[in-house]
Amino acid sequence: ENTKENAKNLHKRKILLIFACRIKHRQMETYKYQAEINALIQQGLKMPEVVKPNDLKGFRFVFSTDMSKSYLPNYIMKPQRAIMNGQRKVDIGGYALSCFTEKDKAIKFYQLLAKNMRNIYKAIGDGISSGIVTNNDGNITIPARNGHYNLFEFPLCDLSKTFKLEEDKL
């Protein structure tokens, strides 16, 4: 009888241990691209300060002809950009989704980029989508004066389901 009781207790402890490990692992895997972010942190980069979005309106550049890649971070679309070299500054924000607080600020930023990069539409898109960024979507950097902020997505975030196309040709 005593060995049965010990076996039951051992089984309960194993289950609790597995559960505790899963909780700890989930806390470490905060963001959708946490493994990639961790790799950059190990190279000495710092995670920016982030806050809750609290249902902030978001505007994002999109590819009007290919929405599937419109909600992927820069470094996921082009992984070679995340490799540190002397040419380019690597930033953890490359694993976040770039958004703006206002449509006119997004358009102004796009026009500024277009002056220096003729084919900007190939890199970041040719349209604008908008939606509400909720606390369930992830955390954001504090919006800059130009309205830009980065959304570090939680694993279940999918803006393609909540954002709608506003402008299909910039």
Located regions from the model:
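Short, Lys/Arg-enriched N-terminal segments with co-localized hydrophobic residues
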Residues: E1-Q27
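ADP-ribose/NAD+-binding catalytic cleft of ART/PARP-like enzymes
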Residues: F19, Q27-D91, L170
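Polar/charged alpha-helical tracts
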Residues: R26-Q27, A35-Q43, D104, Q111, ...
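ADP-ribosyltransferase catalytic core
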Residues: M47, I83-D158
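Charged phosphate-binding loop/patch that engages nucleotide di/tri-phosphates or the phosphate backbone
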Residues: F152-L170
